[in-house]
């Protein structure tokens, strides 16, 4: 039901499929046990960025794109903006930074990718609507563990707060890692509110992207 990187969302959108598995595997399901509670098991014990970089060069790659953040709100870099990052939780190391250093030693270009454009709808009651609220079980998880709001949210709408947060994280990646290229995902083409996202609410980050490329 869906594909791997969308499982965090599908847990809540397809509970008949996923809740029994979580119950069997971890003894509970949302809201008692949700996506946030799986993160400690992400340890990256076999993560060897030097070996990866060497292999990429060997096969003839000239640049590498690694996911800095997908739609789920988890940051694979050493972020000062969210506690849900790979240095403070999970692997306890800077995955984005470590790979970048290894790639540059091999003379390869580096482009952390950023997919937060679709984050507001990932855990929302109404997917990709301009204005929504958290899925019921997500809301209950946040009520029980307030820190979870920084993973699942902080907003579930294309609000000014969302845009400010989006730009701040994107800017942090640029300032900390100085990537050779910028790669970002697309904003949802359609929304239930007349596609206002593409028509205006994304302008701040698009302008920042344009300025950063110049």
Question: Which residue stretches match the model-derived regions?
Answer:
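Mature catalytic domains of secreted/periplasmic carbohydrate-active enzymes
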Residues: 1-214
